[in-house]
């Protein structure tokens, strides 16, 4: 069974994922996969550079340059997501077990990245905003301000 898990920061996704993992489930953390691909996937970086010239220098993504472009232009962000979501989905497909077993895909863009289609069931983890704020403050060592 493949479970797709999504939800906002501080909702409890990590707790759910830890429970699945302790029961022998495979956890596919799409954020970690994305960051690994930024360091290893030359094809993805090449596609980003082709669409957003000057954002990859010596094989390294220049996050500030790219962020300045995509966060100022919704269409540019959609195009970046198309590139990166495709690469992440490809990697998830490579890591999914060929034999039936419990696996969970943890992805903020579960639906946007078309990963939900790989799942037998999807779960949106939610929590009251007050609880989320308290959890984030405790986790990150920050104040509410």
Outline where the language-model segments fall.
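Hydrophobic anchor at the beta1->P-loop junction of P-loop NTPases
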Residues: 3-5
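ATP-dependent small-molecule kinase phosphotransfer cores
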Residues: 32-101
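Post-Walker A helix-loop "phosphate-sensing" segment adjacent to the P-loop in P-loop NTPases
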Residues: 21-30, 42-43
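P-loop (Walker A) phosphate-binding loop of NTP-binding proteins
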Residues: 8, 20
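Walker A/P-loop
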Residues: 14
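ATP-binding Walker
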Residues: 11
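ATP-dependent NMP and nucleoside kinases share a basic, alpha-helical "lid"
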Residues: 93-97, 102-138
């Amino acid at each position: 069974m493949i479970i797709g898990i999504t939800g906002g920061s501080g909702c409890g996704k990590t707790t759910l994922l830890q429970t699945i993992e302790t029961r022998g489930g495979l956890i596919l953390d799409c954020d970690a996969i994305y960051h690994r691909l930024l360091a290893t996937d030359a094809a993805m970086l090449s596609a980003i550079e082709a669409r957003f010239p000057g954002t990859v220098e010596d094989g390294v993504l220049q996050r500030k340059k790219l962020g300045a472009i995509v966060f100022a232009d919704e269409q540019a962000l959609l195009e970046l997501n198309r590139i990166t979501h495709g690469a992440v989905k490809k990697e998830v497909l490579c890591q999914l077990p060929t034999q039936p077993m419990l696996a969970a895909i943890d992805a903020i863009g579960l639906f946007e990245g078309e990963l939900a289609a790989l799942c037998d069931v999807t779960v949106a983890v939610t929590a009251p905003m007050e609880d989320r704020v308290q959890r984030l403050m405790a986790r990150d060592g920050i104040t509410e301000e």
